[in-house]
Amino acid sequence: MKKAYLTVVSNREIADHIYEMTLKGDLVDSFQTAGQFLHIKVSESMTPLLRRPISIANIHAEKQEATIIYRAEGEGTKLLSQKRDGESIDVLGPLGNGYDPSVVQSGQTALLVGGGIGVPPLYELSKRLTKKGVIVKHVLGFQSKKDVFYEEKFQALGDTFIATVDGTYGAKGFVTNVIEENDLSFDVMLSCGPTPMLKALKDSYPDKPVYISMEERMGCGIGACFACVCHTDQHEKAYVKVCLDGPVFKAEEVALSC
């Protein structure tokens, strides 16, 4: 983990209020694991005070560039969406424990399931798994057609299924409906998205290895403030820190309350 300034290469809207930002700098050399995140200071002023945690969607190591994808909905991310090419951004990272690629072997099938803004980290993961010979399938869930992004990029790596809650694109319903209706088989599931989605996946496949990346509000991003604790399934008084111990966990390790 290091603190550094990265330069904005591009920052564009790719879906409704969804932005893709490419950053460049020496810090990218330390981005080695899919599923980690950056803690970004969105303004040089005192407000907003807290950094914003945003997952890494794509790493271009040879260019020292990395891409993040975020939803501009709050004060901080709206400020981030106004950043222009050439500006510098104060970044702390990479943070957290990402996905362990060794949990799925060459020739096996990995089912990657993402919901909304939980989709981005799965792209870098899919790239890495495909490179090692894993058969990758994707199920991506969104609220509506206007929210869909990166479909073609995922499709280039493996079979990709889209679900929208309102049925305006792809299958109508949730990611769990798509998995069941298409009878998608897999050896390992790796997912990222809202807690209700993660809980549904955990409950639906208790006998399968399911890995989840949790979305939690964070304060410090380094485990000091206890803002993102989550109880474990082993003991009601035991907990983990999502920013430090996660955000990726084996589903059976954490208690998911919706």
Curated annotation (Swiss-Prot):
Cofactor: [2Fe-2S] cluster; FAD
Organism: Bacillus pumilus (strain SAFR-032)
Keyword hit for Cell division: no
Keyword Transport: yes
Protein's name according to its UniProt entry: Dihydroorotate dehydrogenase B (NAD(+)), electron transfer subunit
Pathway where this protein functions: Pyrimidine metabolism; UMP biosynthesis via de novo pathway; orotate from (S)-dihydroorotate (NAD(+) route): step 1/1
Cross-referenced SUPFAM superfamilies: Ferredoxin reductase-like, C-terminal NADP-linked domain (SSF52343), Riboflavin synthase domain-like (SSF63380)
Annotated positions binding [2Fe-2S] cluster: C220, C225, C228, C243
One GO term (biological process): 'de novo' UMP biosynthetic process
GO MF term set: 2 iron, 2 sulfur cluster binding; electron transfer activity; flavin adenine dinucleotide binding; metal ion binding; oxidoreductase activity
Residues bound to FAD: R52, P53, I54, S55, I69, Y70, R71, G76, T77
Pfam families in UniProt: DHODB_Fe-S_bind
Domain called FAD-binding FR-type: residue spans: 1-101
InterPro entries membership: Cyt_c3_hydrogenase_gsu, Dihydroorotate_DH_ele_sf, Dihydroorotate_DH_Fe-S-bd, Dihydroorotate_DHASE_ETsu, FAD-bd_FR_type, FNR_nucleotide-bd, PyrK_electron_transfer, Riboflavin_synthase-like_b-brl
Cofactor: binding details: Binds 1 [2Fe-2S] cluster per subunit.
Subunit and partners: Heterotetramer of 2 PyrK and 2 PyrD type B subunits.
Annotated transmembrane regions: none
Annotated NCBIfam families: PRK00054.1-2, PRK00054.1-4
This protein's UniProt keywords: 2Fe-2S, Electron transport, FAD, Flavoprotein, Iron, Iron-sulfur, Metal-binding, Pyrimidine biosynthesis, Transport
Family of this protein: Belongs to the PyrK family.
Physiological role: Responsible for channeling the electrons from the oxidation of dihydroorotate from the FMN redox center in the PyrD type B subunit to the ultimate electron acceptor NAD(+).
HAMAP family: DHODB_Fe_S_bind
